[in-house]
């Protein structure tokens, strides 16, 4: 990226915080985490996990997510979102329809949040 370093993972990786800590220590400022959480696990964990990874690493998170009922009957949660390093959801997709989301981000928020919560210097 011309404007920063992107750390990439997928779906179930979201449950392993050490992966994101390693990506951050290697310079990641943004995470891309495409996922297909089931409706049940998504409803229970999706928002919390995405926001937590953003907060604990001081990174923006781009989280595209499958939504709807698929040919095999599997129902995925959706809720694609972009979260800032403070854990604020900047934009979120509607659960009931496929759509493209976008927002303007301020990359200065990365340094600001990392200075406010200097967890990267502790471990």
Question: Predicted segment positions?
Answer:
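A short, polar/charged loop-to-alpha-helix boundary motif
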Residues: 97-115
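Internal catalytic-core helix/loop-beta-alpha segment
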Residues: 9
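Cysteine/selenocysteine-centered motifs that mediate thiol-based redox chemistry or coordinate metal-sulfur cofactors
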Residues: 1-3, 12, 18-26, 110-123
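Short loop segments at secondary-structure junctions
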Residues: 1-3, 85-87, 106-108
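CN hydrolase (nitrilase-like) catalytic-core segments centered on the catalytic cysteine
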Residues: 5, 15-100
């Amino acid at each position: 990226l011309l404007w920063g370093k992107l750390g990439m993972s997928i779906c179930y990786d979201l449950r392993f915080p050490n992966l994101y800590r390693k990506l951050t220590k290697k310079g990641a400022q943004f995470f891309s985490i495409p996922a297909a959480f089931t409706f049940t696990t998504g409803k229970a964990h999706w928002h919390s996990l995405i926001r937590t990874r953003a907060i604990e690493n001081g990174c923006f998170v781009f989280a595209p997510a499958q939504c709807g009922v698929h040919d095999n009957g599997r129902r995925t949660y959706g809720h694609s979102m972009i979260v800032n390093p403070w854990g604020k959801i900047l934009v979120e997709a509607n659960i009931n329809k496929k759509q493209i989301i976008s927002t303007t981000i301020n990359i200065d928020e990365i340094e600001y949040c990392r200075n406010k919560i200097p967890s990267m210097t502790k471990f």
